[in-house]
């Protein structure tokens, strides 16, 4: 082939050289055709427009550097660093040429405008604002786009076709086009985990090299192409390196590397030198345990280096690759370091392989070929100091000079001669009149210092040779003097102070009696320097083991101290060590404290023994509290002036104040400062002494905390109330003393005490008397606050009594013998007390007044008065007014309902010899009603001397006795002749309960206060909760449950169920609206045989059932869902899960409600009945669905509809809260919230910055009608912030239960501000929300706001199904209207931590305290206190914050695996077996929530099932909810129908994967007990949603 081509060429040349014109023409034609083909090929190159004005040389430089492009130079724009700026375009296009067209590409730090102009709709730019210059650059990009679009608009031209997709993305989905986060934190997700690509144009400088690989892998980047500026001289000890081609300079100062352009006033760029060196020197960038990114250099063009990073799967490496051989030469070199560092460092240094190939170095660094690094020395005559620097010099030049001057004689070897020779071989020479250029192009500026280096090296080499020759000669002078003499003679006149100069330069080393001459290394190659530079950045630091050994010794001694514990194997030693290290606590002291705590010799007041609680108690010393001396000199008409005396300032502490044992009066609290009461509450103390004494101290602190919380709330009421509201009926009240009227009217009168504000605005506690319903006040008082908690002196009196019997803050330990009588319900505990008690010398104490009256009545029923108010008393009365007598025996009924410290005080104050405490260990125990007060578990156990059991019930029938045997140890017997007494009835909704149609027989009991109040509103009488009637007996009882959602207190293990089933003697019937565990219990009791019931009159053992749990193991597969089935499959599935719902004929329910008489329980409101008659309107025609569901027709707003909705959503709010200190408790909750969810690095905030951009962002999301409402708003003054508008939604919300069969569902309401208010506070809270979401630890917690549904699946995708875990769902009914003053306080404190403006925050707070609702459509006006407004700007994020704060206050969030929150929905994954508090009680008493806690196998969040499996999780939309939507009755036309289909397709995309349908069936079965396997239904759903025609068949006109 080669011979043939050569022949053709020769023939062509011969033809061209001949005279034949035809042949010549053919040759010319051939040359012309070749030129045309070449030019056509060049014209097909990508075209790049180079508008910068550059010189001719720079034009040629750019054209030669990038032959892949056809560059057109127009020279129409003058700019700074024109060449570098123009090359950026070429560099970007060159990088994009490497990426496959259409593949998703991340442009790290890129220019999104350039991609839009090119029509690239597949590029996402990560543009973080790392400094102000970045912000300005990004604004310039936006301005360029705006100018381009404006020009098209002026010319009335559309956007070109190739740009439309990109500009459409920019307009509709700007987050896909660009984001303001660093690449490592970019939130853009890829579809189906396809491979992506990335480019980095001059942006990897600011990405840490150690994070680069992991960041690429997170985005599933296959190849990343990068370009950056670099120069070989940067690896030398050079302070400055110039990039001549682009006119820029690198300047190095330590690790700081500055980059700037010459002769320009532009900002400098600063980078990390060590980080850039890693990118240059490292080859592998680890991304995970499996993947690494391998770096390869591509090409170098105009001072820009190109490289690519390729993802490599190390699992595919041949196993022989992993053998690591040791370089013996490098190992011996590293042995010197092994003496200073660890031996492993020597092994690491010996195994380094990077850049060992010099050919590769020379290829990629061509300028360093045959170059060596020479040190240069500069000396100062004035200071005597010497500096050192390095340069690259040709290797041949160095040896030529050294070999020549080595031949000089000693006299001829001078610096001048060496410099002369160096200059001569560097300069031009003239040979025969012709100038010849020197062979070596060495910089003339360094010839002088370079000659000095050659001179010094040669001189020292001669001196070394002389010493070797004279080594065995004898001289009078010492060797040291001889050497110094030789050195001084050799260098005389060259450098002053030769000795100091040589020593400073490292040429000689001095010792006291020795001298060492060391010739420095003449040079090192660039390869060696590159390896050294890389090693320098990777060397390990030394480690001092002395301190760790000392700490280990301390921990060993501490472990010896802990060895006395019984369960040492379960003791967490790692947590103990972390505690001591984090809190700087001595391990030995901490071990002794732990042993004392475990042995109950010492108690710390915490709920959980966390390291923070233990460290807080160990670090600080308890300060002795001083007594508060009172002197009342102010006139007081009803309470006599007080004498001076001492009263306690707070609860007990180990070193408390001294109190004399005197009979103090409660009036000593009069005019006591509120600060004296508040300062001692919730203090951190260490309880010491015996366990009884510790319990007594805890009880006194409990009373102090309760009093402090009440006083604090009264102070808050005084601060908050400003205007007059005489119509309100609240728990708290404020009396204006000077005007003689209520500013805030309480719902009760005749309070015992309150908090008054005097003329000096000082707050004091005052005791009250009343005159005709008005408090008698001092003339110096300004205002007075009272509340329902200040109706009696209970806490004051008890606190006074208990502190009076203490000496030096230590209560005496009671010496009485304590006998615990544990009896089953109905065992005759009260009867036994009456039989054993001697009323002349014994004392009987009971918890309540009713029980006291009952015992007195039964004791005196024979006609002889034995019991009276002196020997049968309530516990509170006894503690407030202890008698001055001694009792022989003490009988306490229902003792477990009391604080254990209270029981000990009762024994102490009664001076009894024996105390009988009658309890039921399985019934409701003492509930701590002060939020966040520490009541450790071991304090809840009474210290008893004897225990007696009563296992024969005189009250309970035989079937209930069977249930009791499952609860108590031992056999429970009964004496009742009644065998069957319990029954249950499931009613069709709460509306079926009515005193007329369904009268209830016997005593009516409920589980919740809400159900109790609702029954009272319906007209039922004599209704109490189960907790209120504990200890009572009734012949017949009726237990009612109106709450349809599950309640945690209704379970087999709940003491509430036990109490409820054991109050009757003959009959008990349970009415419920839903199947629950209590129905199952009653059903089981009804199935018992008569023979089995008779057995409980004799001893019988308890049988247990062996259960086997199933374990599911799945695989992460994608199996397409087959499109099969019929719409009747969906109908069958709906009817199976919700039987009866499809048969409801509710089309005319709204008409029936408007026509028939109706009775509504309405709170105070104003109604305009002129709005009751609706204006006739033409009713629209809607399409009818084939699927029959419980969906209703759209309703029309009117008086009745709106009023019913308002009653349901806003009135009759629950009131379950116990006694809490709102301010202190809110602060504690917020601190827990912050510690639980906020990343520690972002826990500090710089304050909120309201800018024009934040308002513009809010305004851009508003509709045009909203903007029009702001046209006449001047923003000078605020409208009324406490006024809201009220409206309803036309479509009722479908419930996935059976309530629709008996109830008329109320519509959802929207309570909203005017747009003018939203324009002020909307941007502010939007910015605060953004700040909060940025600080949340998103690896563990999901706040589902400002996110897409697919991000739910991404969040749960890293769940480990092999880990044993529990799934908790907290469902709260009446969530919005249950939120009261405490919830607002928590939310405001969170906004304060984020930096909200104080003035606006106060305006917002006052606007949400007491609010007015106006419904102009229905003519309704009412007033609400607090509550969550459904249309407020903070509704969604506020609800999300509250549910998250509620859970963080009760659940240890540091142990949580995953948690998600959205409005009132929550989903928490916790390790299995985690010890949790009573969430039901906490939610009721502290948060006023009717909470239901679900424990499930699969999670349910925002209408979606979260199915976790062995490789992650998949989220399925609730199929039953989807079918319910397919039966909707508000579709207007086919366009509306198509919109519905598309929206359903979006939310149900995961149903196309049928790999996990079996787990989905299990999840559905957890919620709906009648569920069947639904795979056939899911296939049918996909079939109809994916086909427009089939979907239209589901509806007809």
UniProtKB/Swiss-Prot annotation:
Q: Name one GO molecular function term.
A: RNA binding
Residues in (+)RNA virus helicase ATP-binding domain copies = 791-950
Reactions that this protein is recorded to catalyse? RNA(n) + a ribonucleoside 5'-triphosphate = RNA(n+1) + diphosphate; ATP + H2O = ADP + phosphate + H(+)
Q: Does the keyword Zinc apply?
A: no
Q: List all disulphide bridges recorded for this chain.
A: none
EC code(s) of this entry: 2.7.7.48, 3.6.4.13
- Keyword Nucleotide-binding assigned to the entry: answer is yes
Q: Where is the Alphavirus-like MT domain?
A: 72-280
List other remarks.
Answer: Readthrough of the terminator codon UAG occurs between codons for Gln-1103 and Gln-1105.
Query: What protein family does this chain belong to?
Result: Belongs to the tobamovirus RNA-directed RNA polymerase family.
Query: What protein am I looking at?
Result: Replicase large subunit
